[in-house]
Amino acid sequence: MTSTNKTLTQAILNFSKSYSQQHVEQFGHLPTVEHDEQWPSPCDLGSHDTSHHYWQAVAMESVQLADNKEEALSFENVESALNIELHPDIKIYFTTIFSGDIEAQSDDGELSLLFAWNKDDFERLQENIIGHILMKQKLKQVETVFFAVTDEEDMIISVDNSSGEVWVEQVGCKPHKKLSDSLAEFISQLTHKNVVSEKS
């Protein structure tokens, strides 16, 4: 099943916004990340202390509008390299926001939603997706694209490239548990992990 573009985009924007809001309510400030001058991001909102900066997810569209020279990020190169068409939900998911990992809770356990931190990270992500799909093809398994990691070692959450369904799979193995009919439905069912203490 395919999520409508607007529904999936809004689900991602809403969940990332509420993640930041929950962090502010719990800790009195936005999420923080260890600062790396060599790894700038439009998500970076300045110093929290000597080693950490505040961050917040940013819509990629707003970054592109702010810089007329910035081209919209796409997966055309990935599709060309693999000679396949990626499911629309996969492309929407990874081109909606720049963000750090967003921790979440599902009925099946804890997970971290993966996003690109900056343009270079987006390119690294594309390379990882190409590697993942090539592995799937070599193993003659259904082609999937991962978008989240779980608290269980080697267990990832992915989208079936043909159906758009969300599944759990062990790295190198066939998907073994269906979680949702679509990515938008899956994200809409997530809740925010109740963080006991702030990560440094």
UniProtKB/Swiss-Prot annotation:
Protein location: Cell inner membrane
Entry keyword annotation includes Lyase: no
Main location: membrane
InterPro entries: Syd, Syd_sf
Keyword Cell inner membrane part of the UniProt annotation: yes
Membrane topology, from the record: Peripheral membrane protein
Pfam family, one: Syd
UniProt keyword list: Cell inner membrane, Cell membrane, Membrane
GO CC, any one term: cytoplasmic side of plasma membrane
Role: Interacts with the SecY protein in vivo. May bind preferentially to an uncomplexed state of SecY, thus functioning either as a chelating agent for excess SecY in the cell or as a regulatory factor that negatively controls the translocase function.
Family: Belongs to the Syd family.
Protein name as it appears in the record: Protein Syd
The organism of origin for this protein: Colwellia psychrerythraea (strain 34H / ATCC BAA-681) (Vibrio psychroerythus)
Native organism taxonomy: Bacteria, Pseudomonadati, Pseudomonadota, Gammaproteobacteria, Alteromonadales
